[in-house]
C-alpha cells in the first residue's frame, strides 16, 4: 500500500509453500506433527510524481487558423504512455544491473562482446540464446509470454523470416511473435555502443512481471493564461500531472541513490536502487544481450 501523504510504500506477497516431504501417518497417539508456516515477503516501491507543460501563443493560433491547444490535448495521453514505457524499461535495466552485481547474473544470457571484427552468428539473436535465457527460470519458464527488443533486432529476425504473425481474437490485428513469444518492438530498448560494437538488450516478460498503479493527484490538469505575453497578444499554458508506479515484482526499490522526491530515469537504472527479494524462479523476467 502507498503511505498516506507520501510516495513510497510496500507490496506484501506470500512466499510459495515449497515442497517439503510430507508427514507419514501412524497409530502412535503421542507422535504429533509440526505445522509449517507461510512466510511473507515485502517489496518497497516509490511512485513517480511527474508533470509536464505546453504553451501556445494566441497570435500563432490566429494566424494559422488552427487550434494548437486542442492538438496538444489530443497528444497528452500518448506522451505519458511513452514516458512511462521509458520508466519501465529503465526499471528493468536497474533490475538487470542489480542482478549482475549481486546475484551472479542468474537472470541474464549474454553472447555480446566488444571484440574488433565482424559480428558472428553466435553473437547475434538466435533461438539458442533466447531459449538459454528462458532456461534461467527452470521449470517456471512457461510463465514467460513476451519479448521486448530494439527494432534492429526485430528487423534481423524479419530478414530471416522468423517473425510469425498471429491474428488477435477479432482477426483485426496481426501480432508479431518469435518462438511463441509476443514481440514488443521499442527503440527505447538499450543499444549501447562500445569501442567496436553495439550491445542490444532484450527482455523476456512473464504474466504478472510488472505491477502498475496510479497515485492521487490534486490537480491532474489545468490551464492558465498570461495576457501580457507576446506584447499583450496572450499565451495559454496547459499543465498535466501524474503519479505513476511501474514496479518489477520480486524486487524492492531501496531508494539508496535517489536525490529528489521521485526517481529519475538515470536513477531507475542504478543497481544500488534495487534488491531482489524473491527466488529467481519466482521472478518472471529474463534478459538477453546480443550484438545484432
Residue ranges of each PLM-predicted region?
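Alpha-helical scaffold segments that mediate packing/assembly in large oligomeric complexes
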Residues: 59-137, 267-269, 274-281, 287, ...
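Sequence/fold signature of self-assembling virion shell proteins
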Residues: 115-128, 132, 152, 158-292
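Generic structural "secondary-structure junction" signal
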Residues: 4, 47-49, 56, 61, ...
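Assembly/oligomerization interface modules of large self-assembling protein complexes
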Residues: 1-50
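Short, low-complexity, charged/polar segments at coil/turn and helix-coil boundaries
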Residues: 1-7, 13-20, 121-155, 179, ...
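Short, low-complexity, polar/charged sequence segments that are solvent-exposed and flexible
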Residues: 29-33, 64, 72-75, 165-168, ...
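Glycine-rich loops and low-complexity Gly/Arg-rich segments
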Residues: 34-39, 70-72, 78-81, 170-175, ...
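Long, contiguous amphipathic alpha-helices that act as assembly "spine/axial" helices in icosahedral shell
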Residues: 11, 39-103, 139-148, 183, ...
Amino acid at each position: 500500500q502507498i503511505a498516506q501523504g507520501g510516495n513510497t510504500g510496500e507490496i506484501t506477497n506470500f512466499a510459495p509453500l515449497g515442497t517439503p516431504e510430507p508427514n507419514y501417518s501412524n497409530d502412535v497417539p503421542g507422535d504429533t506433527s509440526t505445522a509449517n508456516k507461510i512466510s511473507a515477503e515485502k517489496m518497497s516501491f516509490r511512485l513517480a510524481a511527474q508533470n509536464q507543460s505546453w504553451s501556445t501563443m494566441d497570435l500563432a493560433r490566429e494566424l494559422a487558423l488552427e487550434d494548437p491547444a486542442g492538438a496538444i490535448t489530443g497528444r497528452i495521453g500518448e506522451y505519458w504512455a511513452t514516458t512511462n514505457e521509458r520508466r519501465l524499461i529503465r526499471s528493468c535495466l536497474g533490475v538487470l544491473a542489480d542482478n549482475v552485481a549481486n546475484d551472479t547474473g542468474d537472470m541474464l544470457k549474454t553472447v555480446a562482446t566488444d571484440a574488433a571484427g565482424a559480428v558472428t552468428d553466435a553473437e547475434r539473436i538466435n533461438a539458442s540464446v533466447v531459449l538459454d535465457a528462458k532456461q534461467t527460470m527452470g521449470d517456471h519458464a512457461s510463465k514467460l509470454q513476451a519479448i521486448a527488443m530494439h527494432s534492429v533486432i526485430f528487423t534481423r529476425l524479419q530478414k530471416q523470416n522468423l517473425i510469425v504473425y498471429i491474428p488477435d481474437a477479432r482477426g483485426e490485428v496481426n501480432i508479431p511473435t518469435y518462438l511463441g513469444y509476443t514481440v514488443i518492438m521499442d527503440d527505447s530498448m538499450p543499444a549501447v555502443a562500445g569501442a567496436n560494437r553495439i550491445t542490444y538488450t532484450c527482455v523476456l516478460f512473464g504474466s504478472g512481471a510488472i505491477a502498475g498503479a496510479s497515485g492521487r493527484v490534486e490537480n491532474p490538469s489545468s490551464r492558465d493564461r498570461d495576457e501580457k505575453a507576446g506584447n499583450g497578444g496572450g499565451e495559454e499554458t496547459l499543465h498535466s500531472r501524474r503519479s505513476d508506479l511501474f514496479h518489477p515484482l520480486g524486487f524492492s526499490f531501496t531508494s539508496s541513490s535517489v536525490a529528489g522526491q521521485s526517481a529519475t530515469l538515470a536513477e531507475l537504472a542504478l543497481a544500488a536502487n534495487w534488491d531482489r527479494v524473491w527466488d529467481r524462479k519466482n521472478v518472471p523476467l529474463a534478459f538477453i544481450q546480443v550484438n545484432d
